[in-house]
């Protein structure tokens, strides 16, 4: 049950398991595409790697799972697919803009970008599909972006330039 986190943090986390390369692509207003890279060639762990996910895995946790799956660096195990939240939000604290000592005005969460796998597809609505599916306590419950009212549609962009991980096992043999 990982609802996500900060975009730059997940780029750095992914970098712990790959040498260098793209981690995620983001597209903002005007269809401007930006690729976020891990530029640190050091690898903290180069041994076997499994990513555990379920329907509650969303946003930044989907970026990590998708990137390591696209690199064929890790085997993703869990529910059929993750939450399917392929958007980046920023929180705007209204108290910073309107001074009112009587009560808390709250905040607005604004969607500013859509993110895409390095292989080009979005995780929006579809999530990250597990390589190996296992049942869990949420399997029978409809949870996900596709169950929300008026979700953004799934789409794809060109894939980023990346090389699959050349590691210790044949990825396809493990997941088939």
Where do the model's predicted regions map?
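Conserved acidic, small-residue-rich alpha-beta core segments centered on
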Residues: 2-158
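Hard-cation-handling environments
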Residues: 159-176
């Amino acid at each position: 049950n990982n609802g996500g986190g900060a975009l730059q943090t997940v780029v750095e986390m992914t970098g712990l398991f790959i040498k260098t390369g793209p981690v995620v692509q983001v597209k903002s207003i005007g269809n401007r595409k930006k690729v976020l890279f891990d530029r640190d060639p050091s690898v903290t762990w180069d041994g076997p790697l499994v990513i555990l996910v379920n329907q509650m895995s969303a946003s930044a946790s989907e970026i990590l799972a998708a990137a390591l799956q696209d690199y064929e660096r890790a085997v993703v195990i869990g529910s059929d697919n993750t939450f399917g939240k392929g958007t980046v939000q920023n929180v705007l604290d209204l108290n910073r803009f309107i001074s009112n000592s009587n009560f808390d005005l709250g905040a607005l969460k604004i969607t500013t970008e859509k993110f895409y796998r390095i292989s080009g597809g979005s995780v929006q609505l579809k999530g990250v599909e597990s390589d190996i599916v296992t049942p869990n306590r949420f399997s029978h419950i409809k949870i996900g972006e596709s169950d929300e009212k008026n979700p953004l549609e799934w789409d794809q962009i060109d894939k980023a330039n990346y090389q699959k991980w050349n590691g210790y096992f044949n990825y396809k043999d493990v997941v088939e």
